[in-house]
Amino acid sequence: WGATERLVELGGRAVEGMSVAQILDRNNTAPRYQTFRQTYLDRFQREPGFGGVTAFDAANIVLEALAKHPAERNLKKTILALRRFEGLQHPVVFDEFGEARRDSLIMVVRDGQFVVVQ
């Protein structure tokens, strides 16, 4: 949670050039993310951050698991059996222990913004 907009806001110039690992690319152009982003902006009048994106992904994982196996009473078991879900920016894959695996990005703070290191 440390690499949020709040870090840049509070850190100011002191965090310029700082590198962080993140799962959220605020400039992602995927249609699924852009639709979510616009809906979020319309509703909250600000850009979605880490919390909004991961909460959306988590809710959709639960809803998809319930839709695919409505009679199953053990949600964790269902999620582990399905394993792979489409997130807003990249897949979310659960291992046998229930740990979520996502692609990570290396970002650097440039001009007060998080930018993906190519």
Regions found by a protein language model. Name each.
Residues 1-118:
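Extracytosolic ligand-binding ectodomains
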